[in-house]
Amino acid sequence: MKKIKIKILDDRIGTQFSLPSYATSGSSGLDLRACIKDSIILLPNETVLIPTGIAVYIDDPYITAIILPRSGLGHVQGIVLGNLVGLIDSDYQGQVMVSLWNRGSRNFSVKVGMRIAQIVFIPIIRPIFEIVTNFVVDTERKVQGFGHSGVK
């Protein structure tokens, strides 16, 4: 278990809203809440930056955090992240913000304290690059890229 430092920036966290938490014992992501003063109406195709009321300091270059949309909001409501995936570097100490994008066709109400995204902590491999002129082994795929294997 790795300890990650968290700073509470909104007094409602821990009283009105829970700390970021796992919804189930098998959850990978911790839910993040909208720490806003009033509900916000997010119009179709609009993006808005929502504060979460916390800052994290990972302090380990081999760990990063990613912010992901909540699957129900994305699939059912059309609410996803404006930057698709948020990345929190190990040396960042500012407030965790969530860019919400309404890709749906209806207005969406972001309510005070609503669970809007999830944060996942993952290991990072920091490679040392070896410059080569050719790869020693030819793979079956070689340089075939986007769509080369079809959809069947």
Curated annotation (Swiss-Prot):
The lineage of its organism: Bacteria, Pseudomonadati, Pseudomonadota, Gammaproteobacteria, Enterobacterales. CDD domains: trimeric_dUTPase. InterPro entries: dUTPase, dUTPase-like, dUTPase-like_sf, dUTPase_trimeric. Gene3D superfamilies: 2.70.40.10. One of its GO terms (molecular function) is dUTP diphosphatase activity. It comes from the Bacteria. This enzyme is involved in nucleotide metabolism: it produces dUMP, the immediate precursor of thymidine nucleotides and it decreases the intracellular concentration of dUTP so that uracil cannot be incorporated into DNA. Its EC number is 3.6.1.23. Pathway: Pyrimidine metabolism; dUMP biosynthesis; dUMP from dCTP (dUTP route): step 2/2. Belongs to the dUTPase family. Disulfide bonds: none annotated. This is Deoxyuridine 5'-triphosphate nucleotidohydrolase. SUPFAM superfamilies: dUTPase-like (SSF51283). Its cofactor is Mg(2+). HAMAP family: dUTPase_bact. PANTHER family: DEOXYURIDINE 5'-TRIPHOSPHATE NUCLEOTIDOHYDROLASE (PTHR11241:SF0). It catalyses: dUTP + H2O = dUMP + diphosphate + H(+). GO terms for biological process: dUMP biosynthetic process; dUTP catabolic process. Substrate binds at R70, S71, G72, N83, L87, I88, D89, M97. Keywords: Hydrolase, Magnesium, Metal-binding, Nucleotide metabolism.
